[in-house]
């Protein structure tokens, strides 16, 4: 995980910590019910609440209010959908609303094994909210 980026809904899931294992366990439980929808969401508060943001982590952050506007458009879908915004570094995403955010390196803080390419393919989500 976090090696290649642009992960699709069907790509293998390889949790790397207890939090990720708990999320994956929840997904597995929900998938036992065929009439379910699993949303893999990448969102954050608005405004971005931190004074620093990672310049080396690629992800698909979106603000929670954007998701709220589109959530009902997803309600009749079954399966798994990646939900997020345009692929970007966390720093570039955060700077769109606050130019004063400083950069910080996840690799320097967490080490070389930290997953830097966390982005997802969001094609199914974009199609669903049209």
Name the predicted role of every residue range.
Residues 1-16:
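Active-site "gating" loop of Rossmann-like NAD(P)-dependent oxidoreductase/epimerase domains
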Residues 41-76:
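Substrate-positioning beta->alpha
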Residues 14-42:
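Active-site Tyr-X1-5-Lys
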Residues 61-62, 88, 120:
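Residue-level signal for the nucleotide or nucleotide-sugar donor/cofactor binding architecture
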Residues 70, 74-117:
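Mid/C-terminal beta-alpha module of Rossmann-like enzyme folds, strongest
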Residues 120-130:
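Amphipathic terminal alpha-helices
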Residues 1-4, 48-49, 92-94:
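Short glycine-/acidic-enriched loop or helix-start segments at secondary-structure transitions
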Residues 25-29, 54, 66-73, 82, ...:
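Alpha-helical elements of Rossmann-like donor-binding domains used by nucleotide-donor carbohydrate transfer enzymes
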């Amino acid at each position: 995980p976090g090696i290649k980026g642009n992960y699709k809904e069907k790509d293998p899931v390889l949790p790397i910590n207890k939090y990720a294992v708990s999320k994956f366990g929840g997904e597995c439980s929900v998938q036992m019910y065929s009439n379910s929808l699993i949303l893999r969401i990448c969102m954050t508060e608005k405004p971005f609440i931190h004074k620093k943001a990672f310049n080396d982590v690629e992800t698909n952050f979106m603000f929670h209010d954007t998701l709220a506007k589109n959530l009902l458009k997803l309600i009749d879908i079954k399966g798994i959908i990646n939900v997020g915004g345009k692929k970007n570094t966390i720093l570039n995403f955060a700077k769109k609303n606050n130019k004063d955010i400083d950069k910080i390196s996840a690799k320097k803080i967490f080490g070389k094994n930290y997953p830097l390419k966390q982005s997802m393919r969001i094609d199914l989500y974009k199609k669903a909210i049209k």
